[in-house]
Structures are given as C-alpha cells and as structure tokens.
Amino acid sequence: MKFLDEAKVYIKSGDGGAGAVSFRREKFIEFGGPDGGDGGRGGDVWVEVVNGLNTLIDFRFQQHFKASIGQHGMGKTRTGAKGSDVVLKVPVGTQIFEEDNETLIMDLTKEGQRFRLAAGGNGGFGNAYFKSSTNQAPTHANPGLAGEEKTIWLRLKLIADAGLVGLPNAGKSTFLATVTRARPKIANYPFTTLHPNLGVATIDGREFVLADIPGLIEGAHEGVGIGDRFLGHVERTRVLLHLVSAQEEKVGKAYKTVKAELDAYGGGLTDKPEIVALSQIDVLDEKELKKKAKELEKACGRPPLLLSAAAHIGMTEALRALRDIIVSASNGGDTALPDRSMPHESEVEEEDDRL
C-alpha cells in the first residue's frame, strides 16, 4: 500500500430543501388553507476514524466530497427528507486543519471517533408556517439555506509507542524487520526508507508499536535530503530509540547531528526519553568497538546499548529498555495523548436563521 500522510480536501454540505407553496384541495372544502411543508435539511459532511488504515492515499484519487441537498417540502404539510450524509474515513492519528494548514480543527486519536466537518443547510419553511390571523392564505415560502463549503487539510501522525531515529543507513529498518513482522525495504544506500513503517514488537508477553522513519541528515529541517516532514510521526511516541551506526567514522558527531535536527524541528522531541544504541557492531573488532562506544558515551552522556540486528546481538536488551519506559510512561500518564473530544464550533447547534 502506498503511503500518503497529507491531503487537501474540498468539502460541501448539502443545501436545505425549499419550502412548498401548497393549498389544501378537497371536495366540499372551498377554502382549505395553506398546507405547504418545510424543506428537508441538507446532508452533513463527517469524518470518522476507522480501523485498518495507516495512510491517506484514498484522498489522492478523490479530493471533492459533497453531501446531498435536502428534499423539497410537499403538500399536506409533508416535510422533505434530510439529504444523505458524506463520511470521510481516516486512520487513527489524523489531524484536521483549516485551509491555512496551521489552524487545528480536530485531532482524531481514537477508533470510532466522529466529527462533523460541515453541517447541512436548514430547509426552508413552507407556506403553512406563515399562516396567521391576518394572512390566511400566504403564497410564499422560504428557499433552503445553503450548506457550508470549505477546504481543509488532513494530516496523518502515526500513533506508535516508540520511534526509531538516526542517520540514513543506521540500521533502523533492519532493526524493525528483525523484531517485528514488518518488511521495510532494506538496502545498502542512503534513504532506502522513503516513508514511515510500523511494526508490532513483543517482549516478555508485552506488545508495543514501533515506528521507523526515513533517516535525517544535517540540514533536514531546511529541507536537505528528505527533510524533516516525517518527524511528525514520532511526535506521539513515548520513547525514541536513537541508532548510531558503528560504521560511522565519527559516531559522536553522527549522534549530535540527529539531535540538532530533532531540536530544530521542535514538537517536544528532544524532551522525550531517549535510548541510544550503537548499531551494526558486528562489523567492528573488539578494540574498535570499545573505542567507538566510548566516543558515543561521551557525546550522549551515558553508556550506549550495543546491538546488531543482523547478528541478533543486544536485541532483547533494547526491547526491554523500550518496554520499561513505555510501561512507566503509561502508568504515569505524562505522555498520554491529548483528549480532543470536546465539540468544535461546527458541532454546536446554531440558531434557526431561516426567517
């Protein structure tokens, strides 16, 4: 499945149906009076979080969504039917922004969550509504009100427990493929990973989700390489596993390069718990390994984990370290997802403005 994490979408709710101008006509009733019914309300545009999706690719092929208009009113004071709704189905972790792509409307973090993006227009009143003591036979009715139309942005931030970060070819995809059933592309050239990958790791009966994102290089926050656009996918994680390849000539500099890019991006990434690991250690002899481990320890301020996904060295220790932080964060609630289930202004009932 192809990956898309941002989409621009045009939506329009249905117009309200027009009220009817009608008079009661029955045998032996000369002046039956008005009986025009009200128009039906236009259909709404909703967004719904569904299970089984991890991309916005469907919105590459359809960007326009329009709900149906309400049915017009009819005689015998029959109200028109409401227009059919349109539902945009999105993955967990989707954020909705205004057209400026900056103003957040809603952050959808739970399966089954629904939110009304655009309310249908009210139906117009039929002429029966306007009957009064001074106007026994009104000959006018209201048209239906127009529905709402707007352009919005959908932005996906994958929800994972732990995120893998590092320079290109640091062994992130190999680590993910080794500890989960994910099958990311793995090759010996930079930027093999072009989009985020998710996998479920299990250790001592505990499962958690890992996210692998494309590698960062110096200047990524300014668009160098693939840039830092995928860092949003690790914003929601509880812990980062920072892999530094043992094949780097200067592992300390490699570590600081990625840390600088995380700091430049912001989003609280540098405040997250971080586990540092020297990866691909199977390519070094013992003397070189000690030297680089010491250099990396000096850069990050603590002894790094030593691991090799290819040789299955240190994998269990890394998974247990991740699990411990995830469990601790879950119990403490410090990194829980924000509760944005409060109604937006579009969910609040508006005053009847058909008059």
Curated annotation (Swiss-Prot):
GO molecular function, one term: GTPase activity
Region (Disordered): 333-355
Positions that bind Mg(2+): 173, 193
Compartment(s): Cytoplasm
An annotated GO cellular component: cytoplasm
Main location: cytoplasm
Residues involved in GTP binding: 166-173, 191-195, 212-215, 279-282, 308-310
Main enzyme class: hydrolase
Keywords: Cytoplasm, GTP-binding, Hydrolase, Magnesium, Metal-binding, Nucleotide-binding
The family this protein is said to belong to: Belongs to the TRAFAC class OBG-HflX-like GTPase superfamily. OBG GTPase family.
Function: An essential GTPase which binds GTP, GDP and possibly (p)ppGpp with moderate affinity, with high nucleotide exchange rates and a fairly low GTP hydrolysis rate. Plays a role in control of the cell cycle, stress response, ribosome biogenesis and in those bacteria that undergo differentiation, in morphogenesis control.
Record note on quaternary structure: Monomer.
Protein name: GTPase Obg
Organism, scientific name: Agrobacterium fabrum (strain C58 / ATCC 33970)
Gene that encodes the chain: obg
